[in-house]
C-alpha cells in the first residue's frame, strides 16, 4: 500500500545522489505525483523508484522498536507497527530480534553523509519532491 508514502519526506544528499544516478530521465522529463502524497508515486499509487528507494521508505511497515525517555525521564522501550501489517498486541509479543531497532542504521547513514560533505556543516537533507526538474 502507499498510505505511508507522504509528501515532504526528506533524504540525506547521499541518498538523493543514488536516486539521481538511477532515475535521471524520470527526474528531468517526468512529473511528480500531485502534492499530498510522495512525489515518486505513479498514478496507480506504486513507487517509481522502489528498487532504489531511500532508507525512510525501506523501514516502513516493519515492526519498529526504539529506546527513548518517558515523561519522568526514564528510558523505556517503545514499539510501533502499521496496523495494516499486524496488531499492537502482536507487536508486544515479538522478540527484540524480530523488530527493527531504530537508531543504529540512521546513525550510520548520517555518518556516510557527514563523510561526503564539507567539514563542519550540518548533514544536508533534501525533499524528495525537489529532485524533480519539473514541479
Spans of features found by a protein language model:
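Short loop/turn segments that flank or connect secondary-structure elements
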Residues: 3, 10-135
Amino acid at each position: 500500500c502507499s498510505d505511508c508514502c507522504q509528501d515532504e519526506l526528506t533524504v540525506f544528499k547521499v541518498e538523493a545522489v543514488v536516486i539521481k544516478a538511477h532515475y535521471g530521465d524520470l527526474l528531468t522529463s517526468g512529473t511528480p505525483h500531485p502534492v499530498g502524497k510522495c512525489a515518486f508515486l505513479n498514478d496507480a499509487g506504486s513507487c517509481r523508484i522502489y528498487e532504489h528507494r531511500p532508507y525512510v521508505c525501506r523501514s516502513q511497515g516493519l515492526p519498529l522498536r526504539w529506546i527513548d525517555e518517558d515523561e519522568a525521564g526514564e528510558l523505556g522501550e517503545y514499539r510501533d507497527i502499521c496496523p495494516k501489517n499486524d496488531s499492537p498486541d502482536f507487536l508486544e509479543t515479538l522478540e527484540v530480534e524480530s523488530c527493527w531497532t531504530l537508531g543504529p542504521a540512521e546513525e550510520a547513514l548520517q555518518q556516510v553523509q557527514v563523510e561526503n560533505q564539507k567539514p563542519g556543516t550540518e548533514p544536508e537533507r533534501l525533499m524528495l519532491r525537489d529532485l524533480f526538474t519539473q514541479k
